[in-house]
């Protein structure tokens, strides 16, 4: 998804970040509901996917970007803009580990849903959210490092 300058600014609203966190377990429940309501599960699943897609555009500009959630989004913006040009080893190793952990947790989550295993699904959902939080925390760290040497990035803080 490509976001404009304005869309990135709106996505940095903490409400955007926290509602995405809250939406993920709801998405899992929507997919899981296939075991209960059959193909009607596509309705809540599509609604959740739609919400996650439009989420970056739903909220107003944040009153301040001096918070963890906003800095996580700004860090992701830096990471996507700079790619591997600037990614210190301390971050690259962790990002690679997070990719492996995320794939393992996603596979476990899918398996849990397919097998109708409530415990595996719940644990995998929690693990996905923990992994996302760890990734976001790294984005905050990356942003905090880059903001010191880049005036454009500093202008994103208010």
Regions found by a protein language model. Name each.
Residues 6-45, 96-107, 113:
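Long, highly hydrophobic alpha-helical transmembrane signal-anchor segments
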Residues 116-158:
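Glycine-rich, aromatic-bearing surface loops/beta-hairpins
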Residues 1-9, 77-84:
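Cytosolic juxtamembrane N-terminal segments of multi-pass membrane proteins
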Residues 69-97:
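Short membrane-interface loop/juxtamembrane segments of multi-pass integral membrane proteins
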Residues 31-63, 131-134:
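Hydrophobic alpha-helical membrane-embedded segments
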Residues 53-74, 140-143:
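Membrane-water interface of transmembrane alpha-helices
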Residues 89-127:
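Multi-pass alpha-helical transmembrane bundles in non-GPCR membrane proteins
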């Amino acid at each position: 998804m490509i976001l404009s300058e304005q869309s990135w600014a709106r996505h940095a609203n903490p409400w955007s970040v926290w509602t995405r966190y809250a939406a993920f377990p709801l998405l899992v429940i929507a997919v899981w509901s296939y075991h209960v309501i059959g193909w009607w599960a596509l309705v809540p699943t599509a609604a959740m996917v739609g919400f996650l897609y439009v989420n970056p555009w739903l909220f107003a500009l944040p009153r301040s970007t001096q918070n963890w959630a906003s800095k996580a989004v700004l860090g992701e913006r830096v990471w996507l803009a700079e790619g591997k040009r600037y990614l210190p080893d301390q971050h690259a190793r962790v990002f690679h580990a997070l990719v492996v952990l995320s794939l393992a947790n996603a596979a476990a989550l899918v398996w849990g849903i397919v097998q109708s295993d409530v415990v595996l699904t719940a644990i995998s959902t929690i693990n996905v959210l923990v992994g996302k939080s760890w990734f976001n925390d790294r984005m905050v760290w990356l942003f905090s490092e880059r903001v010191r040497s880049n005036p454009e990035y500093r202008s994103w803080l208010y």
